[in-house]
Every structure is written in structure tokens, then in C-alpha cells.
């Protein structure tokens, strides 16, 4: 049974993280109907987050190698006093802006006493005996996706990412990642609304999702109250990496062929259902 749990949880997390359908909202539904409202962290959840990050990095290996090279060359330029914050190299600017987006996420590591870190405090809002907020978050995610679909039909996105969208993405990511939103769905949508090129927006979103997932995974491992076996960990890691690699390709296919509306309608339907359930929970609990 523990092996089946590892298999299904790895697939579930990979699908809900990479496709814009919100892992947190689906997880909250599972915990709600299991009457688990404590918000305890599972070591298996943490290790799968790390594995999904690895899978995304493998799927986008060329981009990650290029960014690592840019980072190394930047350090070299700093040592030699040749670094320029306004470098015109697109790859260097991409790296600079990704760092800008990630800086606000350091706030997650603020200690919050018995609650652990600020991240775990924000995350605990999912386990409040009602699915009302998750339903709202899912519908907002769907709204972002529909807005993007509309934007792409009326204008051509031809901008490169700059500091302003990078800062906005960082603040948005800080707020939404622990809640019932889809991180990839909302961040990708925000970038497209800013007019960023579609391919660059998707690459940027997936790129910054890797450190976000790594931080989440490490925090969950450090604060885990539910243990896992070595066999569970190995199986979950392998499945999550493979599934994530495939799902990145699938997401790119959806974006390239203008199929995001299917995911937007799924978010709408699922969000509406759990919103109604949440209303009844508020009335009868």
C-alpha cells in the first residue's frame, strides 16, 4: 500500500504542479474529505517537490546550462570588476531578472515560532475546515488563463522580460505559491499580460519554478511530521522526475497549439464545485 501511495502521489503532484490546475487546491480537497485539518507536512510530499524540480530542470537542460554559465561568468566579471547590471546580453538579463523574482521568496524562511516558517504559516490557511477559499483561488486561476487566451488573440506578444514584470512576478509568487493557486498558471499569465514573448514567458515560469519547488521541498522535509520509507522515496523520485519531464513537453504542446482553454475550463468547473462545497461546509460545520 505504501508503494501505491508513492506512485499515485508522485503522479498527482507532478500533474497538478506543471499543468496549471493547482496542486495546493487538489491537496486541500484530499485533506478536507479525509478530515485532516492539521496541515502536517509529509516527507514524501517534500521529496516529490524536489524530484519534480529535477524533472523540470532535465526537460529544460539547455536553458539551465546556459543560465549556470551566465552565473559563473557574472561572478567572474564581479571579481574582475567588469560586471554591468545593465548588460545587453539577453541571457544575462534573463538571469538577472530571475534572481529579482526569487528574492521575495526568501521571506518564506522567516521563523514563525511553533508554526515553523512563514511559508508553513501561509500554507496552513489551506486547512481551515472549508474549501471556500480553494474554490475562489481556482476560479481566479481560471480567470487568469482566460485573460491570457484573450490577450493572445488580440495582440502579438513581442517584449523581452524586464525588471518591472520580474518584480511583480516575485511578489505574486510569494503570495500565491503556498495558497490554492497554480504557481505556473498564474505566473505565466502575468508575464503574458505584460506582453512578454510566449516562449520566453513559459521558459521563465518553468525556470523560476525549480528553485521554488526546491525551497518548498526542503522546508517540508525539515518540518515533516509524517515519515516515509526509503523504498517509497526511491519510487516517488523516479516517477516524479520522469512524469515531470513528459509533462513539461505536454505543457509546451498545449501552449504552442492554443489548448490552454481546456485547462481553463477544468479550473472553472473544479473551482465552482469546491466553492459550492465550501459554502455548505461553512453552513453546516
Describe the residue ranges of each PLM region:
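Multi-pass membrane proteins that catalyze or facilitate reactions on polyprenyl-/lipid-phosphate substrates
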Residues: 1-285
Amino acid at each position: 500500500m505504501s508503494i501505491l501511495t508513492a506512485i499515485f502521489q508522485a503522479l498527482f503532484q507532478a500533474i497538478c504542479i506543471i499543468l496549471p490546475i493547482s496542486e495546493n487546491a487538489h491537496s486541500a480537497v484530499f485533506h478536507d474529505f479525509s478530515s485532516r485539518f492539521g496541515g502536517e507536512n509529509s516527507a514524501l510530499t517534500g521529496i516529490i517537490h524536489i524530484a519534480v524540480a529535477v524533472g523540470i530542470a532535465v526537460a529544460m537542460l539547455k536553458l539551465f546550462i546556459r543560465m549556470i554559465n551566465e552565473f559563473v561568468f557574472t561572478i567572474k566579471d564581479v571579481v574582475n570588476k567588469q560586471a554591468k547590471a545593465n548588460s545587453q546580453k539577453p541571457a544575462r538579463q534573463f538571469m538577472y531578472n530571475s534572481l529579482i523574482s526569487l528574492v521575495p521568496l526568501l521571506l518564506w524562511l522567516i521563523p514563525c515560532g511553533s508554526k515553523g516558517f512563514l511559508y508553513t504559516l501561509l500554507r496552513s490557511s489551506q486547512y481551515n475546515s472549508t474549501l471556500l477559499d480553494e474554490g475562489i483561488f481556482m476560479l481566479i486561476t481560471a480567470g487568469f488563463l482566460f485573460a491570457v487566451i484573450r490577450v493572445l488573440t488580440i495582440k502579438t506578444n513581442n517584449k523581452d522580460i524586464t525588471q518591472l514584470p520580474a518584480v511583480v512576478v516575485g511578489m505574486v509568487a510569494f503570495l500565491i505559491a503556498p495558497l490554492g493557486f497554480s504557481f505556473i498558471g498564474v505566473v505565466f499569465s502575468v508575464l503574458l499580460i505584460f506582453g512578454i514573448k510566449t516562449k520566453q514567458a513559459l521558459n521563465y515560469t518553468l525556470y523560476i519554478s525549480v528553485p521554488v519547488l526546491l525551497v518548498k521541498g526542503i522546508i517540508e522535509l525539515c518540518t515533516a511530521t509524517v515519515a516515509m520509507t526509503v523504498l517509497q522515496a526511491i519510487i516517488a523520485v523516479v516517477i516524479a522526475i520522469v512524469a515531470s519531464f513528459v509533462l513539461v513537453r505536454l505543457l509546451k504542446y498545449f501552449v504552442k497549439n492554443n489548448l490552454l482553454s481546456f485547462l481553463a475550463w477544468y479550473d472553472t468547473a473544479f473551482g465552482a464545485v469546491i466553492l459550492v462545497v465550501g459554502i455548505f461546509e461553512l453552513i453546516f460545520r
